[in-house]
């Protein structure tokens, strides 16, 4: 054990001194928010309790063998314990989502009083501990009743129902909520759910990779994406007309943003990378900032890409007070077919239209991501230059590790340090970034990997009916950073080990 301790201390020293610039919490503005995140289906559990009805995520997860969110971290019953952990950590903000089918079980109409009570209690508990709630209205979990009735996000009826749902949330919770995200990672939501079939409700054209029972990959992602933008804009308009002057909050949309870098120095790969940015970033950002889709997308996708009316264009333009960024890693982009590509560019859908090949960096794979903080810095610089430097929140950033592998998650610490440093560098270069959220606060059910990997700073024992929480080393590091007791690039990190019991084990 002594040999292990010395080896670990050496690794921590190496980790703590591997960055050129020291930074602390005080290196960031006082109003910059450091937080952590979860989502309703992934954290709450209690899927059949107190009036909640099934969502499309319940249906989707029960169709596969990667587990489900029936109990998961049991946040519904353990939220007070988790809020205390956040307060001890010094967390400044907690991002969570509201389960539409818990609050309004039929998707529209009567409010579930027990669902309303749960979210009011959670929000007030956060506020009483000085933690700012950042509330996401939609995170992959459409009430199954609306999917069954009219097809959900591929039907324009969703705009009215989503706006009515948002109205309930603004009215009931808005006095205590200053940050709202309408729809989570809109780009990858439309692609994963309506092209690739890898996210609920699992639509895609027939292919050899995923067995979808319905869908059209060449049209549905664009229809869903269009309705996402219109639903967001409608909810945003409602908030600004009815609530903003009194509640004084902000409302935004989030996108999933891979870092994108040319695979070679060739002109072809540079052009391919710009094309990928146009499709993966510009698809949502250009309408939000300028009121219409990128010309290259309109030319390529043609009549399959819906058209904004003049009124819709004006409503979408400027509808986001901020842009939320979901980012985990970076991929190389090439114009020429490589031996291994992450996403198939041939097929019927989005990636065929994009017409480039995406290659993992280093040892990255679909579920294991290499730390590439320069990729996030590049995204923030690109958004600054291309989209009028809007306010940005990094709403998810974290590192997956094999579940139950270790509490000494030094790789995760290194990852978080590097990405916070990248955010600081981008801000020094003028990016209007205003917050950073680690995914995830505690171990949760993951959308792609179920319970095989975990991102949490707190380990959750999913075999224990009580879902015991145990801090990982990353929780201790984040606590030290937020409380000003760790100066990155100094050797203060060594103190973590002396405070983190050698006997701490799973």
Curated annotation (Swiss-Prot):
The keyword Iron is annotated on this UniProt entry: no
Glycan-modified residues: 211, 216, 363, 429, 461, 483, 499
Alphabetized UniProt keyword annotations: Disulfide bond, Glycoprotein, Glycosidase, Hydrolase, Signal
GO molecular function: beta-glucosidase activity
Keyword hit for Disulfide bond: yes
PROSITE patterns referenced in this protein's UniProt entry, alphabetically: GLYCOSYL_HYDROL_F1_2 (PS00653)
GO (cellular component) term, any one: peroxisome
Disulfide bonds: 204-212
Domain of life: Eukaryota
Signal peptide interval: 1-22
GO biological process: carbohydrate metabolic process
Residues annotated as the enzyme's active site: 185 (proton donor), 396 (nucleophile)
Binding-site residues, a beta-D-glucoside: 42, 139, 184-185, 328, 396, 439, 455
EC code: 3.2.1.21
Broad enzyme group: hydrolase
Known catalytic reactions: Hydrolysis of terminal, non-reducing beta-D-glucosyl residues with release of beta-D-glucose
Record-stated family: Belongs to the glycosyl hydrolase 1 family.
Protein name: Beta-glucosidase 9
Gene responsible for this protein: BGLU9
